[in-house]
Amino acid sequence: MTFTRPTPRDDLIYLTEGGFEPELLYLHGIDLPCFAAFAILSNPAKRAIFRGIYERVCDVAAAEGTGLLLGWIGYRASPDWGGKLGLSPDGLKEATLAGIEFLEELRRAY
């Protein structure tokens, strides 16, 4: 996996997401143990819902011609929180890589 860090442009307005967890919880009824949204990526149905949420933001940025900065939902993907979720260090690594691939898929699509 190659990582490139784009340089923000001074002449471009950027849209950012403001956190999707409340929508997952309250509109879709998805339980987020320890408020760890990254854990839902292993469930295909929940992943599809999550992708739809992200795609809406991507669609707005594309339609408005703005840049887009997406954060990853893995701020809880640490050994402490992973342990509370029953993840081994290898399981946590897999979840982290799955989250990165999730954002890479979106980047390629847009």
Predicted regions: what they are:
Residues 1-110:
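Domain-level signal for soluble alpha/beta catalytic cores
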